[in-house]
Amino acid sequence: MNRYGIQFQVKNSPSLDPEFMPILKFNRAFLQSAKKPVSFAVERSNGQVAVCNTFIHGTPDMREADHYYADRLVKSMLWLQGGFKVYVSGDEDVYNYLKETFSLTGKRAFDADFMAGVYEQPFEVVFCDKVPEEKGASQAIGRHMDGCRIGFDAGGSDRKVSAVIDGESVYSEEVVWFPKTNSDPDYHYDGIVAAFKSAAEKMPRVDAVGVSSAGIYIDNRTMVASLFLKVPKEQFDAKVKDIYIRAARDVFGPDIPLVVCND
């Protein structure tokens, strides 16, 4: 198979999509002849940065291949690790291509708009002499067994809550609800609060609350989640983004430890 001047072998060609190209095969063949160093970095929340140091060809005849490789690489970095700011160093032509591609009028407009919404920051692609250094922030989540704790799972068809004392479950409840078809965020809030209160009643106190649900959560805030699919954007911004923070605060006070994570 030849794609953008890059030749590689594909053992099995799917009959329903004979032009399907395994990206790993392309990348391996591409990097065999690419010699010009370039770097890409993607910045996300709290100053965290993902970095990829790699190579392109940097020649007119391989320009299309370079563009394709850079596009797929940056798109993968965005969806694997997230981010709102892309740094490019090493090649201005690739930078210009990515800047146009990941603009609100480019072919990756969805990606740019989505990430801007997730991080509440304008999405941008910038050129620099040297990309920022890699920076992550590990978190110790879970395995806290001491004290009186609540675990809440917000599912699409039911919500589950457990009360745990020193690692032993003393109460569990599963309630059917319909969050994906309800446009009123107060419906979701009331269901979350009801679950918190139900579990809290079975313990002498509540030391911490943990929440799991499908979606993108940053600093315990709901940035994207299918549970709130029908909620209008204005209502989502006003009542959904901080819904778990509000629910925990309203039931247990402002100082309750809370962690919300994608499951």
Feature map (PLM): residue ranges:
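N-terminal, positively charged, Ser/Thr/Ala/Gly-biased leader segments
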Residues: 8-12, 22-27, 33, 55-58, ...
